[in-house]
Swiss-Prot record:
The lineage of its organism: Bacteria, Pseudomonadati, Pseudomonadota, Gammaproteobacteria, Enterobacterales. Component of a transport pathway that contributes to membrane integrity. The keyword Transport applies. This is Intermembrane transport protein PqiA. It comes from Escherichia coli (strain K12). The gene is pqiA. Its main location: membrane. The chain crosses the membrane at residues 51-71, 102-122, 257-277, 285-305, 347-367, 371-391. It is a multi-pass membrane protein.
Length: 417
């Protein structure tokens, strides 16, 4: 049945392109795509107060985390302690400015910027509309790049690695950092993209009938990748957020494969070159990713060895294989099993960033283990190569258009008549 209702009552699924008529949602309810199961929108209770409270609390915890010592270590009576702000400083001093920059961006600056942006937007700060649109656009683009919780996991892994050399303690800022990780995740979770954009600017009018259960491409429609507005397929710029777009991402497979090949080329030196060098009583011992896993396993740290093996070796390898498989299927060589491809894509998107855990482990070890001739740990070129592998695979997954996997799938079972 064709409907002439305002486009605000409908949404195009960003994952499978199905047009869905949104039901009336009570507080706490969510609408999901009947075709692929993707969450389309969530009706949060107190949509302004909740993210505001979480964001303010998270920013306060972030401030406390940077004011006091974070972790400390004692080896043979020699004590070393660091603050969070000292970690990038050490990396810069060791001529690994790129790793220090990654730490500052992904662990500190990106989460802080996103939290401040949430406060400004959900509370309707007196800002020019164009600036609000730009902030909202950047907010959802940067969301994936906030890695505070991954850094926390890296710190815990570092503790296990260092317990064989001395006693490890946490400083006054460790608990605030743990709280910050939880609060900032909750602040992001309580901001619904569709609600936020509707609050910034109204949905553009659409002067053509809408048919729920039919894909947008069959109706001559496309979804704005930024603000979820439903637009005519031939309209290149969204009138609400000014984002350029197309029915399908232009050259999606070409970009995805190019970035995938780049990550594969970087992955080889990342596993061959040392990721860190341990200077113990004047004896320098370079260590690769696999050597670190073997050492942890031989010392009986089986859970940590398994975590590092999964995050640093299995996940990047399987992610690259999965992305190649998605591209192969999107080219029409698969068995039209779109649901399986969609599940693979969701897993790839979720787990890919967690491979940064090994990079953060090296950052913590390099900053904390500074004990002169007794013991010191330095980052090595393999760590930079591995960080670039993770970043390239993340970009590769982002440039892939998941709707390509659904374009060959029949949709008659979802069409309303």
């Amino acid at each position: 049945m064709c409907e002439h209702h305002h486009a605000a009552k409908h949404i195009l699924c960003s994952q499978c392109d199905m047009l869905v008529a949104l039901p009336r949602l009570e507080h706490g309810q969510k609408a999901a795509c009947p075709r692929c199961g993707t969450t389309l929108t969530v009706a949060w209770d107190a949509p302004r107060q909740r993210p505001t409270a979480y964001a303010l609390a998270a920013l306060f915890m972030l401030l406390l985390s940077n004011l006091f010592p974070f972790v400390n270590m004692n080896v043979a009576g020699v004590t070393s302690e660091i603050t969070l702000l000292e970690i990038p400083g050490v990396l810069f001093s060791e001529d690994y400015a790129s790793l220090g920059t990654f730490f500052l961006l992904f662990v500190q600056l990106v989460p802080a910027f996103c939290l401040i942006t949430i406060l400004l937007l959900v509370n309707r700060a007196e800002l020019p509309v164009r600036l609000k649109e730009q902030l909202a656009r950047v907010l959802f683009q940067l969301k994936t790049w906030g890695m505070a919780e991954i850094f926390l996991a890296g710190v815990l892994v570092s503790f296990v690695k260092l317990m064989a050399y001395g006693s490890i303690g946490v400083g006054s800022s460790f608990l605030p950092w743990c709280l910050f990780c939880v609060l900032q995740l909750r602040a992001f979770q309580c901001v619904d993209r569709r609600w936020l954009w509707d609050d910034i600017a109204p949905m553009p009018e659409l002067r053509q009938p809408l048919k729920p259960g039919v894909t947008g491409i069959r109706q001559g429609l496309r979804s704005c990748s930024c603000c979820t507005a439903i637009l005519p397929a031939d309209e290149p710029v969204c009138p609400r957020c000014s984002t350029k777009g197309y029915v399908r991402r232009r050259n999606s497979l070409q970009w995805t494969l190019a970035l995938l090949v780049t990550s594969i080329m970087l992955y080889l030196p990342a596993n061959i070159l040392p990721i860190m060098v341990t200077d113990l009583l004047g004896s320098k011992m370079p260590s690769t990713i696999l050597a670190g896993v073997i050492l942890l396993w031989s010392e009986g740290s089986y859970p940590v060895a398994a975590v590092i093996f999964l995050a640093s070796i299995m996940v990047p390898t399987l992610k690259m294989i999965a992305i190649a498989w998605l591209c192969w299927d999107a080219k029409g060589h698969g068995k039209r099993d779109s649901e399986r491809m969609h599940l693979i894509y969701e897993v790839v998107e979720f787990v890919g960033r967690w491979s940064m855990i090994d990079v953060f482990v090296i950052a913590v070890l390099s900053a904390l283990v500074r004990m002169g001739g007794l013991m010191s740990i330095y980052p090595a070129m393999g760590a930079l190569m591995f960080a670039l592998v993770v970043i390239m695979t993340m970009f590769s997954a982002m440039t892939f258009d998941p709707r390509l996997s659904w374009d060959r799938q029949p949709e008659s079972e979802h069409e309303e008549s």
